[in-house]
From Swiss-Prot:
Keyword annotations of the record: Ribonucleoprotein, Ribosomal protein
GO biological process: translation
GO molecular function: structural constituent of ribosome
Name of the molecule in the record: Small ribosomal subunit protein bS16
Any one of the GO CC terms: cytoplasm
Annotated family: Belongs to the bacterial ribosomal protein bS16 family.
Coiled-coil intervals: none
Lineage: Bacteria, Pseudomonadati, Spirochaetota, Spirochaetia, Spirochaetales
UniProt key word Hydrolase: no
Source superkingdom: Bacteria
Organism: Borreliella burgdorferi (strain ATCC 35210 / DSM 4680 / CIP 102532 / B31) (Borrelia burgdorferi)
C-alpha cells in the first residue's frame, strides 16, 4: 500500500476549497482519508493554506509521497518543503 499526501476537493460549485490529506494512492480523489493535515483555500485572499508541519514530517518519514500539487503549494508558500527528499 503506497500512501500519498494530496488534496481532497470540498466546497460548493465554483467555490472550491481543499483539504490536505494522507490517503492510499489508489483511493479516489474525494475518498476516505487516513488523516487530515490541513487546508487550502484558493479563492480566499488571506490565510490560504494551513498545514500541520509536524504531522506532515512524520508521514514523510514513514514513506508518504507528496503529490506534485502539494509540493508546488509548499514551495509557493515557503513552508518547510525540503523534508520532501527523505
Amino acid at each position: 500500500m503506497s500512501v500519498k499526501i494530496r488534496l481532497k476537493r470540498m466546497g460548493a460549485k465554483k467555490r472550491p476549497y481543499y483539504r490536505v490529506v494522507v490517503m492510499n494512492s489508489t483511493s479516489p480523489r474525494d475518498g476516505r482519508a487516513i488523516e487530515e493535515l490541513g487546508y487550502y483555500h484558493p479563492v480566499e485572499k488571506q490565510n490560504q493554506i494551513k498545514i500541520k508541519e509536524d504531522r506532515m514530517k512524520d508521514w514523510i518519514s514513514k514513506g508518504a509521497i507528496l503529490s506534485d500539487t502539494v509540493k508546488m503549494l509548499l514551495n509557493k508558500n515557503n513552508l518547510n518543503a525540503k523534508s520532501q527528499e527523505v
